[in-house]
UniProtKB/Swiss-Prot annotation:
SUPFAM superfamilies attached to this UniProt entry: YozE-like
Protein name: UPF0346 protein LJ_1103
Annotated family: Belongs to the UPF0346 family.
Length: 75
């Protein structure tokens, strides 16, 4: 099985404190979320965590878009 970077690690490459882009804002906020599942790759587990704990995420569609970018970058 090939090594795959965690979603969190990928998301951190999208940070940009000067950007108003939804994914950049998600990444900026996730950086400060001390309980974010940093080693997780699984969509369902990440989605459940975010739905229950990420008040900083304005819409799950932002996560969906970021996760698709993650998959595109892993292939």
């Amino acid at each position: 099985m090939a090594y795959r970077e965690s979603f969190y690690r990928f998301l951190m490459t999208q940070r940009n404190p000067d950007s108003l882009d939804d994914i950049a804002e998600f990444a900026n906020n996730a950086q400060h979320d001390s309980s974010f599942p940093k080693q997780e790759e699984d969509y369902e587990k990440l989605s459940e965590y975010l739905e229950l704990n990420a008040g900083y995420l304005p819409s799950m569609s932002v996560f969906d878009k970021a996760y698709q970018l993650y998959l595109d970058n892993m292939n």
